[in-house]
Amino acid sequence: MKTLFLFLQLFFFISSFTASGQQSFTGKIENATPDKPAMDIVLFMFGLDNPVKVGTVDEKGNISIDFPEVLPDTIAPETKEIFSTQLPYALFFSCPDITSVAEGTVVYKGGYFSLSHQNRPWAATLFPVSDIGIIPWLEDRYYQSPIMASFYEVIYCEQNIDLTTLCKESISYTENTIDMEYQYTLRLKKGFNLIEYKIEAIQETGIPDTSPIPSVVTITNADDMDAIRWHAKYYYSQFN
């Protein structure tokens, strides 16, 4: 039986404020190789036909992220409507009962960063993580095991949102009951926001051939860009 104890405060601000996090930052792809050309860093938040450029990477793997202030005007209104969602559905970890409280929010899930070349529109996926050991789980949560580490995703908000939530729930499996806890401390501004998901505890489900699941997660604005390790998964070896 599933029980939910939710203590939630969610405020929407019409006036602007300065959120934690940064709009411009740098990094380096740890597994960069000299045979890879310079590329754009994009988000496919509106599908593969509408990449949103948010930065560049040079031939040495040096990353420069510079989020635009607004979405490109080339994105059609009907496309925005298709991809728009509410905050709970844009978060990687979400409480099931906050939809009514978050009603009226309009956000777009940016997801992971991707690398784009003129000859290879989707050349690679770029994983921002604190430990590369978490990447297999990000690619396959059903059969790979998570580790205690952080990973990062982008969302775009159409309004400022201040969200402080402690969400607790118990999920019963055949042989085990797992107590889950998600702690949200998000101060999201209108525009692009980089979110950190920090896995702090993991529990086994007790079900054979099923991976463990994160049981304690904190969700905050990313504020320590130096802690991010960048790892690229390339899909091509040739770019000519």
Short names for language-model regions:
Residues M1-Q23:
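Bacterial Sec-dependent N-terminal signal peptides
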Residues T18-T26, Y236-N240:
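Sec-dependent signal peptide cleavage junction
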Residues Q22-D40:
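Structural motif
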Residues F25-I29, K53-L71:
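Glycine-centered loop-to-beta-strand initiation motif
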Residues L43-V52:
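Short amphipathic beta-strand segments in non-cytosolic proteins
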Residues V52-G55, Q183-T185:
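Beta-strand-rich interaction surfaces with strong enrichment in secreted/lumenal proteins
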Residues V70-E81, T85-E169:
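Long, low-complexity intrinsically disordered regions in eukaryotic proteins
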Residues S150-N240:
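Extracytoplasmic cysteine-anchoring/structural motifs
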